[in-house]
Amino acid sequence: KGLDAIVEKHRVEKIKTIGDAYMAAAGLPDPQASTAADIVLAALEMRDLIGQRRTERLRAGLPAFEMRIGLHSGPVIAGIVGVRKFAYDIWGDTVNTAARMESSGEPGRVNISATTYALVKDVPGLRFEPRGHVHAKGKGELEMFFVERA
């Protein structure tokens, strides 16, 4: 519920949850509806929420989890699939690269591609930590950045 409220606040489209994965996209279904900056800000807020809940659970002696977030920007194929039960989904290299950003990241951090960095590098209130080129499974070496609030 908390993550859904965050993406709605930032005009980002929740695509689906699969197991422990939460997929969302900016610029869908209308490319003018939201931007790379919107999804970066949503990602930082989601990370903070999960961090707060983690701290609360650990203090209460309960199991807790961490969250890695990966972002990439680019074209996707979007559509509705299904015959009896319909679902909106997205596909393409951009989706795969975003998944590699997530898997190549670190818990509690928002990892972005060079493409996303180019779109948000001048957004006030953000700071970036270059990671250099990092090997990403099936993608080779990709330039990555961690993003934080300034």
Region spans (language model):
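Alpha-helical scaffold within the catalytic cores of cyclic-nucleotide enzymes
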Residues: 1-12, 28-69, 73, 93-106, ...
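A short pre-motif secondary-structure segment
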Residues: 14-17
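Conserved phosphate-binding and hydrolysis motifs of nucleotide-dependent enzymes
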Residues: 19, 74
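Glycine-centered flexible beta-alpha turn that most often forms the glycine-rich phosphate-binding loop
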Residues: 22
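Cytosolic regulatory/linker segments at or just downstream of nucleotide-handling modules
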Residues: 76-78, 104-150
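Cytochrome P450 core scaffold surrounding the K-helix E-X-X-R motif
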Residues: 80-82
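Short linear X-Pro dipeptides
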Residues: 85-86
